[in-house]
């Protein structure tokens, strides 16, 4: 088998010189400094804030500009140049508007092209020429390379270089070149992006985030709880589908469902209009400018889908005793005559109920109309071209956890008990814990995705368990109290008890134990965690357990910013070490364009490398070394006999 593979490879490397050249090239790359990794998390559909962080590389762009031009140009010009790199098309329009004469604009073009070339050259200093070529604007690759590789000893060619720039301006191509070089800079300052979960949730534009990621040069995703809900819905889970519609109704984001993904909500609206009225518990968290009739419409949809969700949960709980969720059979605990429910031995009055479609004798039974609505919605979801594209990308680039360059990336938690031991769950008569449990969760999720026609098998039910189950690494609480929040006034019933992981992650020994569970070196590795907003306002530190745990909820969701005191955190990891970046609230692109101010506040060093880290010490390096080994075998097999 191996010789057949080597024969195939020999078609590409058909002489010894080609093999040797590639070996030299790969071995040289192994000794370059490692590229910069950029970690973001909890985007929650907030596209504008996310794409700003992406464009500025969590401050890397301005840092590079300062490295070159500090003391050479004014701070105001540094801000202007940074804004030009972030939003080249918009900034160019504003700048051109300020010039009275063509001559003055042309002088500005010359100066700016020189600066942009210097910036690209500096940002690409640790990359090979071939990697730089891929990052350059395709239509100007040759011209850009000529300008980039101009040396100090180029006196003989000075006029040649000047003429290139003169002609670019004369032929009306300056805007295109500057724009292309701006995007090259963005691409060069970050080698690889990690999205540590929750692209979806309450924000209005998760689809735009997905499009941005699909077009990004190098990315991976660690699924969040909200991402899995969307994957589950596309995979055939009706209860996951009910949840995403309920959340969109609650946060007045039904446009995502209907306008963005083309899912017809008319049958659901008809059902809602028939059975439900206005209800304060189900009014959306809507824009104040929304007309009252629209708010009432959403309120009715919200009730209709919430009641369908509660009904759909019951059969899963009953057919999956190993989920250990019998306590959540809430519709069966209600005294419908008295409008009361008994939880943990205490009876509570229910408020703002909407049980018009509930049969007290068989409360989890869907009306025929409800079942029809869910069938139509699921058909619509599974036949949405755009959603299919987004979910396929999510599966291709995503995983529940990732081991990358010695670090463990995970959105939620590793389920542990009070002593820090891995919690065990029985699945198909076998006990799973720690890494094995997460692996089995991911296997079921992929199985459900591969068989969207199955709607009530174990794999599909497991996608819902990942959203709400006690031992789910994505949920990390004992129970989800959605029902109680809608219908019970007493706040004690709303509390969701967190897994001990969330206080044990402050403890270095517990974090080292988790790193070892995943086969990572606890002396050098870190756990990089999303999911929970860091309450800096109350003095919480995102760097925990003596630097072993780094919590980087990006805080993109505006709803949490009042409790955190900041917008959130991102992380940078380059060849020199790790830096945590705190962000202020992002107001608007217009503000950045007009003032050049940034949303960054402070950077903190998490870890400093004693020696500059090289490519050979990374995941990419491991793959390159495997390629070198294969090429050396090919050389021996074909060319050294």
From Swiss-Prot:
Pathway: Carbohydrate biosynthesis; gluconeogenesis. It comes from Bacillus velezensis (strain DSM 23117 / BGSC 10A6 / LMG 26770 / FZB42) (Bacillus amyloliquefaciens subsp. plantarum). Keywords: Carbohydrate metabolism, Hydrolase, Manganese. Its cofactor is Mn(2+). Its EC number is 3.1.3.11. HAMAP family: FBPase_class3. It catalyses: beta-D-fructose 1,6-bisphosphate + H2O = beta-D-fructose 6-phosphate + phosphate. GO terms for biological process: gluconeogenesis. It comes from the Bacteria. It is an enzyme of class 3 (hydrolase). Belongs to the FBPase class 3 family. This is Fructose-1,6-bisphosphatase class 3. GO terms for molecular function: fructose 1,6-bisphosphate 1-phosphatase activity.
